[in-house]
Amino acid sequence: MRFISVSSLLLALAPALNAVPVEVAGSAQGLDVTLSQVGNTRIKAVVKNTGSEDVTFVHLNFFKDAAPVQKVSLFRNATEVQFQGIKQRLITEGLSDDALTTLAPGATIEDEFDIASTSDLSEGGTITINSNGLVPITTDNKVTGYIPFTSNELSIDVDAAEAASVTQAVKILERRTKVTSCSGSRLSALQTALRNTVSLARAAATAAQSGSSSRFQEYFKTTSSSTRSTVAARLNAVANEAASTSSGSTTYYCSDVYGYCSSNVLAYTLPSYNIIANCDLYYSYLPALTSTCHAQDQATTTLHEFTHAPGVYSPGTDDLGYGYSAATALSASQALLNADTYALFANAVNLNC
C-alpha cells in the first residue's frame, strides 16, 4: 500500500451494486425494481414497496444516491462488465434524515442514470442489466435490519459511438494541485488503524484456516476447506497490504480527495483504481478499536475497504449485505464476496463474539 500524505485534485465517479441475487427466506416485505431504457445507455429505475407496511430504508449505495455507486449490474455475453465507481462504507447509527427514504405500501421512487458514465460500453452491442440485493432498513435513524430488492432483467442494444461519447464519471486528474497533507492526529489515527488492521486480519486469517468451525459457519455459511483457505488467503493479503505504507497495490488517502464523503460516509474505495479514501467521519465517529461485538471501528473499516480492492486480492469484494443481520443472511457464495462479512468475522475473532 502506498500511503499518500499529500492529496490531489480529482474529479467525479458513478454508480455500484450486487451482481449476485440475494435470497431472504420468509421476508414479507420487499422492494420491486422496474428497469427501462430511456436513451441509448440511459436507464430509469422505478422502486416500489410491495409490502403491506411503510418501510424506511437507507438509499445510499442504492437508487437515489447522487454519488457514483453501483445501482445495476451489466453483462455482455454472460460476462460482467467492469464497474468504475465507488464503494462506500456507511455509519449504522445516527443516520441523517436526508440519507433515508420512506415508502408507503405501493408507493414508488424513480431514479435515472447513464450506465455508460461508469462502465466502458464503447464496444456497443447487447447489454443485459439487472439489480438485486439487500437494503438496510432503519428505526429512529439506526439500521435495524434489511429488506430485499430485485429487478426485471433488461436487455438493450447499445450504439457504440453514442456510448463512447458519454463523459466518464471517474477521472483521475494529474497531480498538479497539492491540497492538505495527512499529518497530526489524522496521520497518527490512520497509522494506528493500519497496525490494528494487520493484527486483526492475521488473527482472522488463522481463525479462518484452523479456528472454530462454528464461528466460521456463522459468518461464511460453510466449513468447506476450500472456502476457509480462500478467506484466509484474502485476510492474509489484507494484512500484508496494511503492513507497508510505501509499497503495495493500493493508494490510501487520509482525506476525501474525490469529494464523495457525506455526513453518513466513513470511507470509500475505487476498486478500478485500487484507491481508498477516508472521510471526516472516520476520525470523529469511529473508535480505533471497538469493544462491542458487530460494532464499527477504524480498523475493521480499513479492513473492509481493503477487501474491496482487487489489487489486494482478486476479485475484490462487493457490498452484498451490510451489517450483521444482512451479512449473516447471505449464502456461502455471497458471503465469500461480501466486504462486511470479513470485517464482522475479524471483529468476532478479536472479541471472541
Swiss-Prot record:
GO molecular function: metal ion binding; metalloendopeptidase activity
Cofactor note: Binds 1 zinc ion per subunit.
Record bears the keyword Oxidoreductase: no
Signal peptide: 1-19
PROSITE patterns, per the entry: ZINC_PROTEASE (PS00142)
InterPro entries with a match to the protein in the record: Fungal_M35_metalloproteases, MetalloPept_cat_dom_sf, Peptidase_M35
Enzyme nomenclature, EC number: 3.4.24.39
Protein's GO biological process: proteolysis
Propeptide segment residues: 20-176
One GO term describing the cellular component: extracellular region
Family designation: Belongs to the peptidase M35 family.
Function field: Secreted metalloproteinase that allows assimilation of proteinaceous substrates. Shows high activities on basic nuclear substrates such as histone and protamine.
Protein name: Neutral protease 2 homolog AO090001000135
Source organism per UniProt: Aspergillus oryzae (strain ATCC 42149 / RIB 40)
